[in-house]
C-alpha cells in the first residue's frame, strides 16, 4: 500500500473485527461518542474551508490535522513555493488559533525565539525589576521555517519548547499556551551551510510530511486562483478549548491488543539487530525505529479513526500513518542509496510483508 492510496473505511475482514472488538470495550461514554461525531463533522468542514484557499495537498492536510489532534509536532519537507506557510496560516484561522512564523537563520539566537528579560523602572518609586518579554514561540501554532539553517543551540531551544511545552529564561520557566503545535520546514535541495537535525531530535517530531509538486490540473487551478486579486474568506470551525477537549477524546480511544501487536511487529521489523528483521532490512538500513515510533503509530491511528468518525482503531489507520511516522526514524545505508532504495520503498514493503494477525511467527516477514 503506497502513501498516496487512501486507506478504506472499516471493512468486514479480520482487521475490522479486531477494531470492533476494541469498540465493544470502549472507554468512551455516550457524551464522548457525540464528541467523536462532532470531530468527524468538524474535520469535513475544516477540509472544505481549507479547500477554498489550498489546492490539492489532501494527504498533507490530513496528516497535519492528525498530528494536531494527537498533540504531536510535524516536520514538513518540500521545496520552496509549495504553500507550506499558506497551509499553516489558513489552518490556524480555521481553528481560531494564534499563529507565529519564525524564519530560522544562522544568526538567530535562542532568546529571539523564547523571549528575553528586560529591566523595567517604576516611575513612581524608581524601583527596577526584570520583566519577561515573550518571544514568537508564545503562540498556538508555530511555523519554524527552515529549521536546519540555525545552529544547534537555537534548535535546542525550540525542541525544549516542543517537548516540555515551556521555555526557560533567566532561570525561570514560562508555560506555553495550549493547544501548542510546531510545524518545522526543511528544504531537501539546498543543504550547504545548514545544520542537519540529529536523529535524536528528529525523533521528537511525530510526523515527517512530504510536500510534493501539484498535479497539472491542480497547478492550472492554482494559477487561476492566485492571479485574480481575490482572497477567499475562511470561517472559524473550532476554537482552542474545543481542540483540547478533542485531543483528550483521542487519547481515550481504545485499541485492541491485536492492533498493538501489529504495530509492534512493524517497528521491531525495522531493527537490524533483532531476529524479527527481514534480510532486506539488514541489507538496506543502518538503524531502525525506536519505541517512540510505536507510540506515535498508535496515537496517529487513534486520531485518524476519530477523524473518520470511528471509536476504535483498525490496522488501516496504522498503515495510513506509517509513512510519516517511520520515514525519519529509519536510516538507510550506502547499499540502499546505491540501489536507489528510499525509506518509502522500505516502509511500503514492510506494510506488505508484515501480517496484521499474529501468525505465531511474530515479525516473520518475507526476506529479500
Whereabouts are the PLM-identified features?
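Walker A/P-loop
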Residues: 68-106
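Pre-Walker A (pre-P-loop) alpha-helix and adjacent loop at the N terminus of AAA/AAA+ ATPase modules
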Residues: 35-82, 268
Amino acid at each position: 500500500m503506497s502513501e498516496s492510496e487512501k486507506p478504506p473505511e472499516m471493512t468486514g475482514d479480520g482487521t475490522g473485527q479486531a477494531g470492533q472488538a476494541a469498540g465493544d470495550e470502549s472507554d468512551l461514554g455516550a457524551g464522548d461518542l457525540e464528541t467523536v461525531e462532532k470531530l468527524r463533522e468538524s474535520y469535513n468542514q475544516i477540509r472544505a474551508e481549507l479547500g477554498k484557499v489550498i489546492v490539492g495537498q489532501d494527504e498533507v492536510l490530513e496528516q497535519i490535522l492528525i498530528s494536531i489532534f494527537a498533540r504531536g509536532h510535524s516536520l514538513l519537507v518540500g521545496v520552496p513555493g509549495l504553500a507550506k506557510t499558506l497551509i499553516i496560516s489558513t489552518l490556524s484561522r480555521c481553528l481560531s488559533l494564534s499563529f507565529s512564523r519564525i524564519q530560522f537563520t544562522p544568526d538567530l539566537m535562542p532568546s529571539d525565539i523564547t523571549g528575553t528579560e528586560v529591566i523595567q523602572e517604576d516611575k513612581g518609586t524608581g524601583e527596577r525589576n526584570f520583566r519577561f518579554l515573550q518571544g514568537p514561540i508564545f503562540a498556538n501554532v508555530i511555523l519554524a521555517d527552515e529549521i536546519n539553517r540555525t545552529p544547534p543551540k537555537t534548535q535546542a531551544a525550540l525542541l525544549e519548547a516542543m517537548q516540555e511545552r515551556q521555555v526557560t529564561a533567566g532561570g525561570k520557566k514560562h508555560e506555553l499556551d495550549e493547544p501548542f503545535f510546531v510545524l518545522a520546514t526543511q528544504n531537501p535541495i539546498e543543504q550547504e551551510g545548514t545544520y542537519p537535525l540529529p536523529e535524536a531530535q528528529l525523533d521528537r517530531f511525530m510526523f515527517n510530511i512530504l510536500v510534493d509538486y501539484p498535479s497539472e490540473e491542480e497547478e492550472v487551478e492554482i494559477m487561476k486562483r492566485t492571479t485574480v486579486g481575490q482572497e477567499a474568506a475562511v470561517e472559524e470551525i473550532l476554537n482552542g478549548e474545543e481542540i483540547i477537549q478533542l485531543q483528550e477524546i483521542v487519547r481515550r480511544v481504545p485499541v485492541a491488543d491485536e492492533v498493538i501487536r501489529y504495530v509492534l511487529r512493524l517497528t521491531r521489523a525495522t531493527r537490524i539487530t533483532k531476529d524479527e528483521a527481514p534480510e532486506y532490512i539488514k541489507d538496506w538500513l543502518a538503524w531502525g525505529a525506536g519505541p517512540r515510533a510505536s507510540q506515535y503509530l498508535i496515537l496517529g491511528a487513534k486520531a485518524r479513526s476519530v477523524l473518520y468518525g470511528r471509536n476504535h482503531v483498525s490496522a488501516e489507520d496504522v498503515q495510513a500513518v506509517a509513512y510519516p511516522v517511520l520515514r525519519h526514524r529509519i536510516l538507510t545505508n550506502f547499499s540502499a542509496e546505491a540501489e536507489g532504495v528510499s525509506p518509502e520503498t522500505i516502509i511500503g514493503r514492510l506494510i506488505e510483508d508484515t501480517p496484521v494477525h499474529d501468525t505465531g511467527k511474530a515479525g516473520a516477514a518475507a526476506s529479500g
